[in-house]
Amino acid sequence: MPFLLHVYIYQLICVFYTDIHVYTHIYIYTYVRRDILNGGSSFNNLIFQFLVPFQFLLLYISEDIRHSSRVYFLRLDIWHTIPRGSRTVFYVLFLKVWIGQSSYVYWGIGSFITINIVPWRPQQPGQIEQA
């Protein structure tokens, strides 16, 4: 199982947004962005376009009383680093989960379900990856 998938599962398990959780978001974002700028892979393109923006949204709307002031400014910095195209995906996924949730379900599970119903096909052998 790819390393980033392990990290994403860890994100789903985490209920409390601690400093480690915040820094993991930053690490995933910088790692995937660097990988894509260097050519990237289909798996990392999927994470960059869907998983990472939505996870940042979860981080942005979550309340962490212990770190509220420090994390608040960190969230603003993160928000401005997300490309415009990913911000659009951000809003769409947020609305899909928000409208689709009729009970108190942990947001991580909601995001996982939403992300997995987004149409996406792995790259076929020999197919040229489009920018």
UniProtKB/Swiss-Prot annotation:
Q: Does the keyword Acetylation apply?
A: no
Q: What Gene Ontology cellular component terms go with this record?
A: membrane
Q: Which UniProt keywords apply?
A: Membrane, Transmembrane, Transmembrane helix
- Keyword Membrane carried by entry: yes
The protein depicted here goes by the name Putative uncharacterized protein YLR101C
Membrane protein topology class: Multi-pass membrane protein
Question: What does the record's miscellaneous section state?
Answer: Partially overlaps ERG27.
Per UniProt, subcellular location reads as: Membrane
Kindly list the residue ranges recorded as spanning the membrane: 3-23, 41-61, 98-118
Q: Which residues form a coiled coil?
A: none
